[in-house]
Amino acid sequence: MLGYAFGAIRHGADVQIVRVQADVGPGFPRFTIVGLPDSSVSEAKARIRSAFHHAGLPFPKGRITVNLQPASLKKQGSWLDLAIAVAILRASASPSIPHDSTVFVAELSLDGGLVPQSGLSAIGLRMRDEGLSSLCVSTDQRLPWPFDNMFHMMRAADLADVVTQLRQSQVHAVRSPARNVTLPETTRFVPPLNGHPVELRLLAICAAGRHTLLMVGSPGVGKTTLADAFAHLLPDLTEDEALEVAAWQEIANPDYAFTLRPPVRRPHHAISARGLLGGGRWGTPGEVTLAHRGVLLLDEMLEFSHASLNALREPMDRGAIECTVNGKPTLFPASFQLIATANPCPCGYRGYGDCSCHDLDVRRYWTRCPGPILDRIDIVHHVNRDTGREQGGASLDAWVERVREATALLASSSGRTSTLSDDAHRVLRRACDRLRASERDREKIAALATTIAALEGRDEVLAPHVEEAIVWRRPGSLSPVRNAIT
């Protein structure tokens, strides 16, 4: 007799639903698993036999063949233990268990208990895509709280409990533990910002339009504090976006707590290019992937190696990075927002006080950052000490709601394709001609102007919006090298 059940396996952050077929027939007792199982899957045979015994369930006598579909995909890990056991129970019809489309994900212990697994966030997106609506896990399994609304949840303590619930067709929707819910970002501590009204407006523009930013200034001027506070302005992710983020975060941190807040990654300047990009035999995500849909914060950007910074070119352009995993090219998501800080020179005081650096040293210092990376940064802003003492203007918290509204407006109007008025077109054309702007400069100025208009609640981009955008990204004067040595 044939029985089947649905399980799942994970490859990196991707999940594949597996259809487990079991055939129990006459013949010499033998338990075979086919369908490209690795050693961890094959070891399930011993765990399943013992789990049946301790659950008080008769283990079928005769020839047992288990097939894992699709057979062409290599199966690894212990996620399939419970699905294999349920398929065997259904094939043996002792006890009789109805077939359904529930996905079973748990490891079996020798005493029949269900062992929770790490990294299940990706299952939600895969099950939804394939039209599956019921999930069975351990009672101790931590799951993202959106699962409670997305699926019928069946939680069981052991194999005997699974059998009881399936025979009674009871699918219990149980709330995930409250510890999985992260408090809104507005309740978190935000470093106090004294003054900085110009910089706060700039941060709001960057947050609303996902513009990249490099802040240059002397030590102690506040650029790092501003960079740290930037994430406070970002709106929450959607549930689908948060599940996608969690799928990758759980690879690096199995104890990752699900949250709607965008991730913020702050790698040390000694990190290698491999550490930024990820890859390797096990498909480990790098910092650019862990910052997907969030912020990659590079404090003291010029202390990073030239090779590490140059590695950012592809993910900044494509929003993804192609890595080699087990000899196969694999695309990792890397749509991050770069926020960086830097000193103007090795001593840190060029243009801000008594600088002891020779011009040649300053030029050599800035050559640590590849020109193409600087060109891809939307705004290079110099933070002055005088600016840091200015008072007035909206507070950081006051900008949060404006950024949220501007982000929604940009999304509803297809973002950067908002209409420029005739006057705005003329201002943009004349400025770009006068300043010999490149096509990239022109595109970035138009995008900045669109964001500025959205912050004011406007669909149409007006001339003043373009004029402000030109101030933030002035073609021909963005080079920190030029500004630092003059």
Positions of PLM-derived features:
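Peripheral, non-AAA+ core regions of ATP-driven protein-machinery
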Residues: 1-213, 218-225, 324, 460-463, ...
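Walker A/P-loop
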Residues: 213-254, 318
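Walker B catalytic acidic pair
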Residues: 293, 299-301, 311
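Basic, amphipathic alpha-helical bundle interface domains used for macromolecular binding and assembly
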Residues: 34, 40-45, 60, 67-77, ...
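Conserved alpha-helical scaffold flanking the Walker A/P-loop in AAA+ ATPase domains
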Residues: 204-206, 257-263, 268-296, 328
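Alpha-helical scaffold elements adjacent to nucleotide-binding pockets in ATP/GTP-utilizing enzyme cores
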Residues: 47, 51, 84-87, 122-126, ...
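Short loop/turn elements that form and flank the Walker-type P-loop nucleotide-binding site
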Residues: 59-62, 98-99, 131, 208-210, ...
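Catalytic P-loop NTPase motifs of RecA-like helicase/translocase cores
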Residues: 111, 298-305, 348
